[in-house]
Amino acid sequence: MDQLRRSLQDAPIIEKDGYHYFVHPISDGVPMLEPSLLREIVIKIIRKASLENVDKIVTPAAMGIHISTAVSLMTDIPLVVIRKRQYGLEGEVALFQETGYSENQMYINDVEAGDRVLVLDDVLSTGGTLKAITEALGDIGAEVEDVVAVIKKVGGENKIDASPYAVKTLINVDVVDGEVVIVDERGDG
């Protein structure tokens, strides 16, 4: 995890409404995402995730897309993007996403009862997004085989902790005194 660790330690911190954010290529698209960093992350995801029975990778728009696309290309597992736009297609399922900084309606298409899915996201912070997604997938009747987030920001309430799903992460960090501190460079799971 050398590149991921270094890139997080070098990440600028911004404050918005009392919440401290790191600005990182994986979570924000800035600064520029180097292919070698993305490759390192994808290899770690493939090694950590339980993929044997997965039919589909499911990821929320927008910052899970680049990671999930790369994993899909490497594994030949189809990708479903949960969108913030409603299309009104048959079988579309709405979910309500609440994070530390926003509330949104999101929409799942192309997931059906019996599908076995990997849920993949960029950052686990409050757990609001992953909780909403896993609940909606359960309501559809899909089987959540695994849940992976690249980066976990520790501290504070994490809504996914109360769910039946254990989220695997690649690295766990905190923001202390305006800097990213690596809490566990191997993550959870």
Curated annotation (Swiss-Prot):
<dbReference type="Pfam" id="PF00156">
    <property type="entry name" value="Pribosyltran"/>
</dbReference>
<dbReference type="InterPro" id="IPR026597">
    <property type="entry name" value="HGPRTase-like"/>
</dbReference>
<keyword id="KW-0808">Transferase</keyword>
<dbReference type="InterPro" id="IPR029057">
    <property type="entry name" value="PRTase-like"/>
</dbReference>
<protein>
    <recommendedName>
        <fullName>HGPRTase-like protein 2</fullName>
        <ecNumber>2.4.2.-</ecNumber>
    </recommendedName>
</protein>
<dbReference type="InterPro" id="IPR050118">
    <property type="entry name" value="Pur/Pyrimidine_PRTase"/>
</dbReference>
<dbReference type="GO" id="GO:0006166">
    <property type="term" value="P:purine ribonucleoside salvage"/>
</dbReference>
<comment type="similarity">
    <text>Belongs to the purine/pyrimidine phosphoribosyltransferase family. Archaeal HPRT subfamily.</text>
</comment>
<keyword id="KW-0660">Purine salvage</keyword>
<comment type="function">
    <text>May catalyze a purine salvage reaction, the substrate is unknown.</text>
</comment>
<dbReference type="InterPro" id="IPR000836">
    <property type="entry name" value="PRibTrfase_dom"/>
</dbReference>
<dbReference type="GO" id="GO:0016740">
    <property type="term" value="F:transferase activity"/>
</dbReference>
